[in-house]
Amino acid sequence: MIRLILLLCLASLSSGLLNGQLSDSGSWYKTPEELIQDIYVAVSAKNSESVDWQRVRSMFYDEAVVILRTSRDKSTQFTPDGFIQDFKDFYQNPEVKVNGFGEKILRMKTMVYKDIAFIATVYSAEIIGSQRPPTRGVDLWLLAKKDGLWKITSVVNEVISAGEELPDEPAWKF
């Protein structure tokens, strides 16, 4: 009887720990691309309360570094928790609070070697229903496997200014 109880407790604990990084399909991220595709979906929502911030947090190493463009002339470094808090604060913007926010990947380039990966994305971001056109940007993601699961180790971001395009170089043709 004690063994059965221990087994049930262990199974419950294991499923609780692993559920932190399940994609919408209900399976672990088998590829780094699945993780990156899902983070854009995960942060897009009608309001902050409908975002599963715990799920977003589970996508990052605890020590991950997030560097985002926070104004025209400034980038800010965040921890994963700071990144999430910045997003929660953004969702308090009255227009975002009423209409929601959406991000989507326009293009993606991936390099994987064993348990490490680099992914570059060109994305669009918009306040849903806004008269302003969507903003485009570039995210450069580094990932590594941890306990068999892909996790984000770092991301750095740059906004593509209106009317600008990426450099006309082979590395940016994706």
What function would you assign to each model-found segment?
Residues 39, 56, 64, 119, ...:
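Hydrophobic pocket/interface hotspot
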Residues 103-105, 133-140:
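Short, surface-exposed coil-to-beta transition loops
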Residues 136-164:
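Short beta-strand edge/turn micro-motifs at domain boundaries
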Residues 4-13:
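Sec-dependent N-terminal signal peptides
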Residues 40-45, 61, 65, 88, ...:
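Sec-exported extracytoplasmic/periplasmic mature domains
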Residues 24, 66, 70, 75-129:
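Surface-exposed, charged secondary-structure patches
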Residues 47-75:
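N-terminal, post-signal-peptide region of Sec/Tat-exported proteins
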Residues 18-58, 172-174:
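Short, low-complexity N-terminal intrinsically disordered segments enriched in polar/charged residues
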